[in-house]
Amino acid sequence: MCDTLVATPDYTKSRTMILAKNSDREPNEAQSVVRYPRTRQKQKGLKATFIQIPQVKETYEVILSKPFQMWGAEMGVNEHGVAIGNEAVFTKITPPKKNDGLTGMDMLRLALERSKSATAALECITELLAEFGQDACGGYENKDMFYFNSYIIADAKEAWGLETVDRHWVAEKVKGF
């Protein structure tokens, strides 16, 4: 399993927010570190990993660490200092396995491209979850790697833990570590 951690300013010597994440993807799956600049979008839609969704008029600059073949990302930060890491969540609820939803990594990238704060990113992910769901294979060679997602979302002032299953979610503001 991947791990993401956050320490809020009250718990760090430097009095700054710290978010850290590792990746445990498949051995033959390379990670790409990429930067996408702020862009005024001309197209009305975008193709995420598996599905087409509406595009917003402007996307914020992002730096992402992502599996090379995926549209979305495991972790990243945007020009407003919003940082997000995501994890696979395996539950007793089985995804339909139809590839007709977003990946958790798609939602992470979309939230960074569209949000000026951690709270706005939380709202973006939960709205995407409600509208498009998360039924999409997250594996590279393993084409049966369907899972739900959890996230740690932070900016300089606040951090959130977000757990999801299917289209359901629960969030809690992080205070401390």
Briefly describe each language-model feature range:
Residues 96, 107-114:
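Second-shell loop/turn segments in exported
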